[in-house]
Regions:
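Conserved nucleotide-binding/hydrolysis micro-motifs of P-loop NTPases
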Residues: 74-78, 129-132, 165-168, 193-196
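Conserved beta-strand segments of the P-loop GTPase G domain that flank and frequently precede/overlap
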Residues: 124-129, 134, 160-162, 189-191
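Conserved ATPase-coupling elements of RecA-like P-loop NTPase cores
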Residues: 80-83, 134-139, 169-173
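Amphipathic helical hotspot of TIR/SEFIR-family domains
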Residues: 110-111, 132-155
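Conserved catalytic network of the ASCE P-loop NTPase/AAA+ motor domain
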Residues: 59-64, 115-119, 150-154, 180-181
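Inter-motif core of Ras-like GTPase G domains
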Residues: 81-132, 151
Length: 198
């Protein structure tokens, strides 16, 4: 959480999906469904959201039709993120999975697990080197590990993206290499706000 997932989804859709959608009504509806994103410590996403609600059909490389739908979810809580506590107590939220209210952190974890296990075809693990906001790198390590280990435990294919203000810098390179060594996966650094089409 607070790694740039919503920003990535918005940029991905803006650059790779919306320009290739032929139906204008579908394109406008998809724009309306894009997630909000902002910097800082405050959690923006509150529940899993399919973007777009119905998979968009686009053509890759000119003529290969594919259906694309991303899922924006809260992710596991990062230490230092805010927005899940009101007063001195954790916010209680209603979810589709329980008949009673549950703590926000539990809802985020349940929603994230459901996305990983039940909905995702390919996972995108979004993490950061700590340069994109107010949280430090160490605050992302536990939720990053939990996410990667969960995907590995069920054999779900995934990629790791390291969001960084300096994706070609030494710190981003070092963090990517640490992730690769620790989990045996490829980690790619990038500045997700700056994603551009070709």
């Amino acid at each position: 959480m607070r790694t740039g997932k919503s920003t990535f989804i918005k940029r991905f859709m803006d650059v790779l999906v919306l320009p290739h959608m032929e139906d204008e009504n579908d394109r406008e509806r998809t724009k309306d469904e894009l997630p909000q994103s902002a910097s800082g410590r405050t959690i923006m996403t509150t529940e899993p959201k399919f973007v777009p609600k119905e998979a968009a059909e686009v053509k890759l490389m000119g003529d290969i039709p594919v259906k694309v739908r991303l899922i924006d979810c809260v992710g596991y809580m990062a230490e230092g993120a805010v927005g899940h506590v009101e007063g001195n107590e954790e916010r209680m939220v209603k979810t589709p999975w329980f008949e009673h209210e549950i703590p926000f952190t539990k809802a985020a974890a349940v929603g994230t697990r459901k996305v990983i296990h039940d909905h995702a075809t390919i996972g995108i693990v979004m993490t950061t080197d700590g340069t994109i906001g107010e949280l430090e790198r160490r605050q992302y390590e536990e939720p990053e590990e939990k996410t990667i280990r969960e995907l590995q435990s069920i054999g779900k294919p995934f990629v790791v993206l390291v969001n960084s203000k300096k994706p070609y810098g030494e710190e981003a390179k070092r963090i990517s290499e640490e992730i690769e060594e620790k989990y045996g996966v490829k980690a790619n650094a990038g500045q997700l706000r700056a994603v551009k089409g070709r």
